[in-house]
Design a protein with these regions (language model features):
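Membrane-interface segments at or immediately adjacent to transmembrane helices
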Residues: 174-252
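Secondary-structure junction/capping motif
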Residues: 39, 104, 184-206, 260, ...
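Transmembrane and membrane-interface helices of multi-pass
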Residues: 2-197
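Alpha-helix initiation and N-capping motif
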Residues: 108-111, 199-203, 226, 274, ...
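Short alpha-helical interface patches
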Residues: 99, 107-119, 205-214, 223-236, ...
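Residues that form generic nucleotide/phosphate-binding pockets
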Residues: 34, 117, 209, 232, ...
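Solvent-exposed soluble domains appended to multi-pass membrane proteins
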Residues: 236-248, 252-255, 260-424
Length: 424
């Protein structure tokens, strides 16, 4: 009868569940890549050109599926785990349709900023509603499936199964990861996070952002070690002095998405589109700057420039503004602003976007800036053609106002643009 065939099929799947888990893991991994890359053939190319990386990604998914052996509701948990991976891949695909940097664990810390940016080029209120509706529907389905769905009736190994799963998660994955990294199948650090996800797969890239929280604590780290380093530095340091009344004002501008059009070889121009920049380039010091991000993550370029600390010290996709600088045991961090303040400079930030975006209001106070003039404090009347971002014209007057506010001081002003923000 139908009931007997149903139970025989269930018994067959349970008997060979490890094999089916491997097949399911490969399917999930491929599906996630198709969604993330938004192209079926790109996913096929990834499997063909990075086969071992693809199989390693599938191994991570396989390990996550092994958790089902601890419970009777195995079918339900398989659906849940499958749904979670595909949901993460879908989020990544949506994000990559609006920016270059893929989805990472640190983006969860950006959720308050994201919800504050509805009806922008990033996403609309309608898109947010659809996402919430789909997630809610899936949760309702899961609840009903957990209540009404089948339960495992076979014998459970209450000791062997947990030990095997713990060994797989705690020993198997680290050893396999180390072997894959040593064989150059995957990389331990992504100089370019977008390229890393593309070459090594979303599952590994996202997992790295979860467990990779930056540099480990050095074995010899102690108060005595730090005191010895401080003594060594103090023995050779020199004091910075500037003649009174001759301190130069310093203006640092982060100009989003700016390039020299002449660097694009296939473009032909009837006249110089950026004559002022080229005049400065010809008459003063100039050069190229290597930055840790492309297409998103502006705050990490800021962090490197202002503090001198490399993003290689931090985890994959991490934003120090949203992590270390928000910890209570980090009252301050040395920066250009704090160093200039110590020799009498006034230090200011001017930015025509929301103060809380990337938690800049907190970060800049930790870096020692005296003032932060954000969008909320400006009289903004002009916006870009898309209507999403204020034009940067307002920053000229606001930068001058910041310097004029300290008549008897020289100033360091860090001005951040937003008009050229986002996709074109």
């Amino acid at each position: 009868c139908i009931r007997d065939r149903y139970y025989k099929r269930i018994a067959f799947f349970n008997k060979y569940s490890l094999i089916f888990h491997f097949i399911l893991a490969c399917f999930i991994t491929f599906t996630v890549e198709v969604i993330s890359r938004r192209d079926f053939f790109s996913a096929v190319s990834f499997v063909g050109n990075h086969t071992w990386a693809y199989l390693y990604n599938a191994f991570i998914v396989f390990a996550s599926l092994s958790i089902v052996y601890l419970f009777k509701t195995r079918a339900q948990l398989r659906v849940l785990i499958t749904g979670l991976w595909i949901f993460l891949g879908t989020v990544n695909g949506i994000i990559l349709s609006n920016r270059v940097t893929p989805f990472s664990y640190t983006d969860f810390k950006m959720l308050p900023d994201l919800f504050a940016m509805q009806n922008t080029n990033y996403f609309t209120a309608e898109e947010a509603t659809v996402v919430v509706a789909v997630v809610a529907s899936f949760i309702i389905f899961l609840v009903l499936f957990f209540i009404k769905g089948p339960k495992y009736q076979g014998k459970r190994h209450v000791v062997l199964s947990p030990l095997a799963i713990v060994a797989l998660l705690v020993v198997g994955i680290p050893i396999t990861t180390q072997a894959a990294q040593s064989s150059n199948i995957i990389a331990s650090y992504f100089a370019n996070i977008a390229q890393g996800y593309s070459d090594y797969g979303f599952v590994y890239g996202f997992s790295t952002s979860v467990v990779g929280r930056g540099m480990d604590k050095p074995d010899d780290y102690s108060k005595e070690t730090i005191d010895a380093i401080e003594t060594l530095v103090d023995s050779s340091k020199e004091e910075t002095t500037v003649s009174a009344g001759k301190e130069p004002n310093i203006i640092c501008i982060l100009l989003e998405s700016f390039i020299d059009p002449y660097d694009v070889n296939f473009l032909q121009m009837s006249e110089d589109p950026i004559p002022t920049f080229h005049s400065l380039e010809q008459n003063f010091t100039t050069g190229y700057l290597t930055v840790p991000v492309v297409g998103a993550g502006t705050a990490n370029t800021e962090f490197e420039v202002l503090t001198g600390m490399s993003m290689q010290y931090f985890g994959t996709g991490e934003y120090p503004y949203k992590t270390i600088l928000k910890q209570s045991d980090c009252p301050s961090v040395e920066s250009i602003a704090s160093d200039l303040s110590s020799i009498g400079y006034g230090t200011h930030v001017v930015h025509n976007n929301t103060a809380t975006f990337y938690s800049r209001n907190n970060a800049f106070s930790k870096m020692g800036f005296d003032t932060f003039t954000s969008k909320e404090l400006m009289n903004i009347t002009e916006y870009t053609p898309s209507g999403s971002w204020p034009t940067d014209k307002v920053l000229v007057n606001e930068t001058v106002k910041a310097m004029d506010a300290t008549e008897n001081q020289s100033d360091f002003v860090y001005t951040i643009t937003v008009g050229s923000h986002g996709d074109y």
